[in-house]
Design a protein with these regions (language model features):
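N-terminal beta-strand motif that seeds the catalytic metal site of vicinal oxygen chelate
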Residues: 1-19, 45-46, 64-68, 116-121
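Vicinal oxygen chelate
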Residues: 4-12, 55-81, 83-121
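Conserved active-site tyrosine of GNAT-family acetyltransferases
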Residues: 17-21, 80, 108
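Residue-level detection of beta-strand scaffold positions
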Residues: 23, 37, 65, 100-101, ...
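Conserved acetyl-CoA-binding loop of GNAT-fold acetyltransferases
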Residues: 23-29, 84-87
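Conserved short beta-strand elements that form part of the metal-binding/catalytic scaffold
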Residues: 27-61, 110-116
């Protein structure tokens, strides 16, 4: 059964957002991966703070970005498209994490789907 795997907080001003979440929730942040990307410690699950980006052309991400873990990304992608969803960002590999895609649902919400794989290259 697919389950929530990760959430990301998108921010225009990373230092300001970091201070807010440190003060509000006591979370700590560790630089990881590309510049401007921080893993959040203390959020209770995989979580990150990252610079705001466009997954759908011309529309910056607002709010929290959720990613669902699935056993087979290709099958899930086909099911999402058959249900009326659209690919927002094609499949990419995150080394040591897995294969990731982003989709737009029928209501315009953008979300990620990942097939976790610690051996991904």
């Amino acid at each position: 059964m697919p389950n929530l795997f990760h959430f990301a907080i998108n921010a225009d001003d990373l230092p300001r957002a970091r201070r807010f979440y440190e003060r509000a929730f006591g979370w700590t942040f560790n630089a990881w991966g590309p510049p401007g990307f921080y893993m959040i410690e203390g959020a209770g699950m995989n979580a990150s703070l990252q610079g705001r980006r466009e997954l759908v052309a011309g529309r910056k991400m607002i709010g929290f970005e959720c990613t669902v873990a699935v056993p087979n990304l290709d099958e899930t992608a086909a099911a999402i498209e058959a249900a009326g969803g659209k690919v927002a960002l094609p499949k990419s590999i995150i080394v040591g994490v897995g294969a990731l895609m982003f989709f737009e649902d029928t209501e315009g919400n953008v979300f990620g789907v990942i097939q976790p794989d610690e051996k991904a290259e």
